[in-house]
């Protein structure tokens, strides 16, 4: 189906894609809803237009392109490395603006040279925007979820707390609430006395047996929800989380990390200084970060317009490392955004691990920026 009402610069954008030797790809507007509901993140989930098939399968209008492009790559059993470009409509419930709008972007799948692929994504995003917005100075904000994960792991927090904090990365309101809970733990309440004693005892088998008896007595079927073992382990995890307290020193370390906001050219030194002062070993996460900075310089990207903000993330759950957004300097409107999603294709059914990075353009915002000249 031909695209209509495309912005007038669409042909220039497609020419930029062609110059980068990427393969144009199209995906169906109607998509299976499950992948988006499972891994797209709460911010996107609540904006999805849902429907269902005659057989009751949950479907949705395409809310973004990364997941559909990855699904199409898996379905066609195409080899890697592979670079795809797309341009088409996405559909999201929004308070302001149209609920259907155009996005375009590039997904880079299977390049095992991670620093080079990351640098290429940022270079392509900024390079294309520079052609579409001549004379405008761009501003790029970078974050790195892998560095945050390394900090959280180095502090030795229980795995459950690590997962919670990592899941909240990029959402400062949620992250601050979790940190407040770590400083002043909220103990588990509302449990039956017998269940509470069994959870506290650590006797998993006894707790499972008790839960089985209670479920049988109340006529509750395990097929209708979690099994007794799953419930027991969930209760145990909740108890561990509720009893975990982050000491003042560790809390201040996290606060110090999340406050880092420096030009990218100074970021490697700032992270190394932070790690040394805190006595943390960030290992591979820091070396990968440094490799990306070097790759950006080697690719000729103007580092003077790039900033690193340790607390910066993007509201999509599938990101695993680099995240970035591009604006015109002095403007809050995000014109392009992207990041690395190395686990996404495996989650969607790929038999092999496929490293991946990509970005998308908001064409309506670019059009507005062009009109403001």
From Swiss-Prot:
Keyword Cytoplasm listed? The answer is: yes
Q: What InterPro entries does the record point to?
A: aa-tRNA-synth_II (IPR006195), aa-tRNA-synth_II/BPL/LPL (IPR045864), HisRS-like_core (IPR041715), HisRS/HisZ (IPR004516), HisZ (IPR004517)
Q: Where would one find the signal peptide in this protein?
A: none
Q: Which pathway is recorded for this entry?
A: Amino-acid biosynthesis; L-histidine biosynthesis; L-histidine from 5-phospho-alpha-D-ribose 1-diphosphate: step 1/9
A GO cellular component annotation in the UniProt record = cytoplasm
Q: Does the keyword Transit peptide apply?
A: no
Q: Which keywords label this protein?
A: Amino-acid biosynthesis, Cytoplasm, Histidine biosynthesis
Q: Sorted alphabetically, which SUPFAM superfamilies does this protein's record hold? A: Class II aaRS and biotin synthetases
- Main location per the UniProt record: cytoplasm
As recorded in UniProt, coiled-coil segments are none
Biological process per Gene Ontology, one example term? histidyl-tRNA aminoacylation
Q: What does the UniProt entry say about where the protein is found?
A: Cytoplasm
Gene Ontology terms for molecular function: histidine-tRNA ligase activity
What does the subunit section of this Swiss-Prot or TrEMBL entry state?
A: Heteromultimer composed of HisG and HisZ subunits.
- Cite any additional comment in the entry: This function is generally fulfilled by the C-terminal part of HisG, which is missing in some bacteria such as this one.
Record function comment? Required for the first step of histidine biosynthesis. May allow the feedback regulation of ATP phosphoribosyltransferase activity by histidine.
Query: To which protein family does this belong?
Result: Belongs to the class-II aminoacyl-tRNA synthetase family. HisZ subfamily.
The name under which this protein is listed is ATP phosphoribosyltransferase regulatory subunit
User: In the UniProt record, what gene is named as encoding this protein?
Assistant: hisZ
């Amino acid at each position: 189906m031909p695209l209509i009402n495309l912005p007038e610069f669409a042909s220039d954008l497609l020419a930029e894609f062609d110059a980068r030797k990427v393969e144009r790809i199209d995906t169906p507007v109607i998509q299976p809803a499950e992948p988006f509901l499972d891994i797209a993140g709460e911010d996107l989930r609540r904006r999805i237009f849902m429907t269902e098939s005659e057989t009751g399968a949950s479907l949705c209008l395409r809310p973004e392109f990364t997941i559909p492009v990855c699904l199409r790559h898996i379905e066609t059993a195409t080899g890697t490395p592979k670079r795809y470009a797309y341009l088409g409509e996405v559909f999201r419930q929004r308070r302001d603006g149209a609920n259907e709008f155009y996005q375009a972007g590039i997904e880079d799948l299977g390049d095992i040279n991670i620093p080079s692929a990351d640098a290429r994504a940022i270079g392509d995003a900024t390079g294309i925007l520079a052609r579409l917005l001549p004379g405008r100075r761009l501003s790029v904000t970078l974050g790195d979820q892998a560095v945050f994960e390394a900090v959280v792991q180095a502090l030795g927090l229980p795995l459950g707390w690590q997962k919670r904090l990592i899941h909240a990365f990029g959402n400062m309101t949620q992250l601050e609430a979790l940190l407040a809970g770590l400083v002043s733990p909220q103990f588990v309440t509302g449990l039956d006395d017998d269940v509470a004693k069994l959870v506290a005892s650590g006797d998993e088998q006894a707790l499972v047996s008790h839960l089985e008896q209670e479920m049988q007595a109340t006529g509750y079927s395990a097929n209708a929800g979690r099994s007794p073992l799953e419930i027991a382990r969930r209760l145990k995890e909740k108890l561990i989380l509720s009893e975990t307290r982050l000491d003042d020193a560790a809390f201040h370390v996290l606060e110090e990390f999340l406050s880092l906001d420096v030009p990218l050219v100074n970021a490697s030194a700032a992270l190394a200084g932070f790690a040394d002062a805190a006595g943390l070993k960030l290992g591979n996460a820091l070396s990968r970060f440094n490799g990306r900075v070097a790759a950006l310089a080697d690719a000729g990207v103007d580092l003077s317009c790039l900033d690193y903000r340790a607390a910066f993330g993007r509201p999509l759950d599938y990101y695993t490392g680099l995240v970035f957004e591009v604006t015109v300097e002095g403007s809050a409107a995000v014109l392009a955004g992207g990041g690395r999603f190395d686990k996404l294709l495996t989650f969607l059914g790929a038999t092999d691990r496929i490293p991946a990075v990509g970005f998308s353009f908001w064409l309506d915002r670019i059009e507005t920026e062009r009109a403001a000249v």
